[in-house]
From Swiss-Prot:
NCBIfam families noted in UniProt: PRK06076.1-2
Similarity annotation: Belongs to the complex I subunit 1 family.
Protein name as it appears in the record: NADH-quinone oxidoreductase subunit H
Reaction catalysis annotation: a quinone + NADH + 5 H(+)(in) = a quinol + NAD(+) + 4 H(+)(out)
GO terms (BP aspect): aerobic respiration
InterPro entries: NADH_UbQ_OxRdtase_su1/FPO, NADH_UbQ_OxRdtase_su1_CS
Length: 328
């Protein structure tokens, strides 16, 4: 039993890494297409039918590019920083149930690496550790733009980690568990049982904080092209830069799964329709990340901090108090 469980876990880890690494590349294709559509352009069209092979071309380019390490960088930290970003993104996925359980060849498969009873806390903790990727990469790069990016990243991520944690306290109080599977079961009665209806404020707060956690527009301060070039990634090239890129897009997919499971019923009763519904919700939230980049400008760092500490955090605290009073 222990050997089969170990083998199953290894297979799950490999499948998650392979699928979401590929989805990171595919996500860039859809991002280019969405941005092009909204800006009245064509996007990728030349490499393969409808430009679909552009992803493969970009992958080959990254693998074959020279791995340049500038002279004055702090070598070991510079090299390990991209690994931290990619590794923590996939580590956070261990507590996410991507689909309902299903049976194949008489063997029941649970599409989650580990259903730990502190799943949400684990995910938030690992995402917090992921901050060290851009932070160390920027500090070790011996580049003023990278250093500014690292400072911005530390301020943004640490601040919005607080908002993220406070926003989900109210739903946790209602469900009485930190497991995402328990959250799904709590909402399995149907669309009327979704937590978003009873906790709309928590949903909005968590969704806003998700943009800061993933470093996406309008909170794209750590790699703001017109201010600090590519931010912490300015001195990186080849697959080291690619690891930062994979970590960012994998986080977008994972946070979309978490939002869908926390607030929008997840996969419901575990049926095929529920599984397809979960994937549709994830696709919508991923599209929303792309749409926001096309529609919104970046905001200033001081505006971002003002929004966090003077608007979102007080609202989150008030929401917790109101939820506690209602539940008494």
């Amino acid at each position: 039993m222990e050997a089969s469980y170990f083998i199953e876990t290894i297979i799950k880890i490999v499948v998650i890494v392979l699928i979401f690494s590929a989805l990171a590349g595919i996500g860039t294709y859809f991002e280019r297409k969405v941005l092009a559509f909204m800006q009245r352009r064509l996007g990728p069209v030349n490499v393969g039918p409808f430009g679909l092979l552009q992803v493969a071309a970009d992958g080959i380019k990254l693998f074959t590019k020279e791995d340049i390490v500038p002279t004055n960088v702090v070598g070991r930290i510079f090299k390990i920083a991209p690994v931290i970003t990619a590794a923590t993104a996939f580590m956070a996925a261990a507590a996410i149930p991507f689909l309902p359980s299903f049976t194949i060849f008489g063997y029941e498969v649970h599409p989650i690496v580990s259903d730990i009873n502190i799943g949400i806390l684990y995910i938030l903790g690992i995402m917090g550790v992921g901050l060290y990727g851009p932070l160390l990469g920027g500090m070790a790069s011996a580049n003023k733009f990278s250093l500014i990016s690292a400072a911005r990243g530390a301020a943004v991520f640490i601040s919005y980690e607080v908002v993220t944690g406070l926003s989900i306290l109210a739903p946790i109080m209602m469900v009485g568990s930190l497991s995402l599977i328990d959250f799904n079961e709590y909402q399995s009665a149907g669309i009327t049982s979704w937590i978003v209806w009873t906790q709309p404020v928590a949903f909005i707060l968590f969704w806003i904080a998700a943009f800061a956690e993933t470093g996406r527009t309008p909170f794209h301060l750590i790699a703001n092209d017109h201010e600090i070039i590519d931010g912490f990634g300015t001195e990186y090239s080849g697959m080291r830069w690619g690891l930062f890129f994979i970590g960012e897009y994998a986080n977008m997919f994972f946070i979309s799964f978490v939002i869908s499971l926390l607030f929008l019923g997840g996969y419901g009763d575990g049926s095929l329709l529920g599984a397809l519904g979960l994937l549709a919700k994830v696709a919508f939230f991923f599209f929303f990340f792309l749409w926001t980049r096309a529609a919104w400008p970046d905001i200033r760092p001081d505006q971002l901090m003002w929004l966090c500490w003077k608007v979102l955090m007080p609202i989150a605290l008030i929401n917790i108090v109101i939820t506690a009073i209602v539940m008494m």
